[in-house]
Amino acid sequence: MFKHAVLALAMVASGLPVLARAEILGAGSTAAAPVYRIWSAGYTAASGTTLKYDAVGSGEGLKRIRAGTVDFGASDVPLSSADAAKAGLVCVPSVVTGAVPFVNLPGMPHGQLRLTGEVLARIFLGKVETWDAPELHALNPGLALPRLKIHPVVRADGSGTTYHFTDYLSAVSADWKAAYGTKSTLAWPADFTAAKGSGDVVKAVQATPGAIGYVDYNYVLDNDLNAVQLRNAAGHFVSAQVSGFRDAVLQSAWNRKGDFTAPLVNLPGPDTWPITMGTFIIVPAVSANGARTLDALKFLTWGYFHGDELAAHAKFVPLPERVQAIAYRELARVTDTAGTTIGLQSMPANWAK
């Protein structure tokens, strides 16, 4: 009941009609595209307003919201409070998913290959070069590993999926941390295949026997990819699934403190997926076009209040209510150039307490 009352307040607080515009423009994360599109279908049915979303990658989404060419940017990389303030932006989470390594090994049963974070790092450092290497045999004694060269496929563009993938590798491998660290864009070795966007990563791996790449969970499901098992912080080999992403959120500072800038990788728990990742919506803190920004806020608010089941259907994890409450407080700071709060000023600031 409380959620629905707050939603109604948010919709009317600005005094603008719900159907003020016919279309919202968003761009960014390829990982989050499925949930924004499924939310859009529900939101259009409820409001008449549509969403045009371009899945162009997190880096490009951030560029477009900074340039003011979209109503919201979408990124899998959270902006720190300092970076958001410096850029004049507000960044809040929408849902949670996971990054998943996958392979093209002819004859290999789906979901059976086991890797540790350390070995995965060595593969992407170019230090493990064939699939029959001793460290891979040690992890997979019951599998017939082929004598194939390993062909890493990586992202060429600025990618939130790359950010979380490398954040995980930095957490489990000192060698990786020293060589690359956590980044959205890397100077990959010249003999790696670099693809723009998750869809092209999938195509490149599928076209190359011996290839390994990484994408978010929805691409694994939609393309029936051969995802690997990873050893998590508890020492258990686990497969990527929604319950493992949810366990990571419950173990994290997101749930304990409402801190959605905290990492979700390599967290404790017997079933936790070790490369869990949030995805975020970014809007201007001071909007030159209040009506357009208000429409973006209405869409996100609708997703928070009505989109949990739709997010789960799309294989994403909805946010804990405590995290949503912190997000509302952030959104309530958005104003127009006259200093007037747009849209969400009626939300109680103490809801999270």
Provide a role label for each language-model segment:
Residues 12-21:
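C-terminal segment of classical bacterial N-terminal signal peptides
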Residues 7, 14, 350-353:
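A cross-taxonomic marker for long C-terminal extensions/tails that follow the last structured domain
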Residues 21-353:
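Flexible loop/hinge segments at secondary-structure junctions
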Residues 1-7:
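Bacterial N-terminal signal peptides that target proteins for export
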